Amino acid sequence: MKKNTSPILTGTAFLPDGTGCASPTSHYTFLPSEKVIVEKVRFRNRFRIEVVGDLYIPKNIDRSRKHAAIIVGHPFGGVKEQTSGLHAQKLAERGYVTLAFDASHYGESGGEPRFVASPDINTEDFSAAVDFLSLRD
């Protein structure tokens, strides 16, 4: 009988950025846009939980004026590097300022225990996001 000598590969694959390391955006499920600037932002909700988000700003926007913004949330169990970030980026490419954030207890945001869905806290996260954006210069 012939023995199978094919190697078995296990582990996690990643796409290198040319330096042999994973790129800083490798945890996103979509490619970054050349038309958009992304800023990491942090703010607290009224439960004092730190909420972490990505603010998507069109590169050609007039920063001397205030602009309307769209807040994009993720489904329960998701994070900002997935669908909500993609939607936020696509809207920013069309000229809107957008914010995609990790809900409390998920992703980079705080909150214990982890991976708990609370409609009350989730609603407060959106309220805190509105407050954060309205107070921003």
Residue ranges and their predicted role:
Residues T83, V116-D137:
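Alpha/beta-hydrolase active-site loop
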Residues G77-Q89, A103:
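The serine-hydrolase catalytic nucleophile loop
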Residues V72-P75, A100:
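Structural cue for short, hydrophobic secondary-structure segments
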Residues Q82, H105-A117:
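Glycine-rich "HGGG/HGxG" loop immediately N-terminal to the catalytic nucleophile
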